[in-house]
């Protein structure tokens, strides 16, 4: 028995495609496929790996679930939240998390533009809304927009995925458009 685990951020449906390809090539093989995306931040990868705030595992069989549960047993014992779901949901969670954070950054930058035009202090606005436990203060720092190796590509990938299934994500698309507009016209 082999369990193939995808750790990378991959388009929704990749796990199923990997499984189908493997079954076609080796119909007699005993295996499962799992999606287990990493949530490592740039500059904090080692800490995030050792002390993740959550683990997301997409599986489609009890056998795969048990293997992954045993693999993550040390984190389970430390009460790290572990979310077991199907592969497509696991793949989507990774994109949704990164896109949400990118959209939050875009939001505070839009508020910064408004503050500049009406004479308000964006840092006080960010502090005031960030104290709301439902919102939180992280990613409420006005600046050049989101970047890095993940947020831009994951945002556009999620927009394209939604378009392919006729479920447009207008807020996310506008967030990406805003980022591009500010790159070319600061």
List each language-model region with its residue ranges.
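ADP-ribose/adenylate-binding Rossmann-like module
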Residues: 1-11
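A short glycine/serine-rich beta->alpha loop
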Residues: 141-145
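Helix-enriched interaction subdomains in cytosolic or periplasmic regions
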Residues: 148, 152-176
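Single conserved hydrophobic/aromatic residue that forms the stacking wall/gate
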Residues: 178-186
């Amino acid at each position: 028995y082999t369990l193939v685990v995808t750790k990378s951020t991959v388009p929704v449906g990749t796990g199923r495609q990997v499984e189908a390809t493997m079954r076609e090539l080796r119909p007699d093989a005993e295996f499962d496929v799992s999606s287990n995306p990493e949530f490592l931040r740039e500059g904090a990868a080692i800490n995030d790996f050792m002390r993740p705030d959550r683990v997301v595992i997409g599986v489609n069989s009890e056998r795969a679930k048990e293997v992954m549960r045993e693999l993550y047993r040390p984190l389970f014992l430390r009460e790290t939240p572990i979310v077991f779901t199907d592969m497509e949901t696991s793949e989507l969670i990774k994109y949704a998390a990164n896109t949400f954070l990118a959209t939050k950054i875009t939001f505070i930058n839009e508020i910064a533009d408004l503050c500049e035009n009406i004479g308000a202090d964006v840092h006080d606005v960010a502090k005031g809304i960030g104290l709301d436990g439902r919102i939180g203060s992280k990613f409420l720092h006005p600046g050049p927009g989101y970047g890095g190796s993940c947020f831009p590509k994951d945002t556009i990938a999620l927009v394209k995925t939604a378009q392919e299934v006729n479920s447009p994500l207008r807020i996310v698309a506008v967030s990406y458009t805003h980022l591009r507009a500010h790159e070319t016209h600061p």
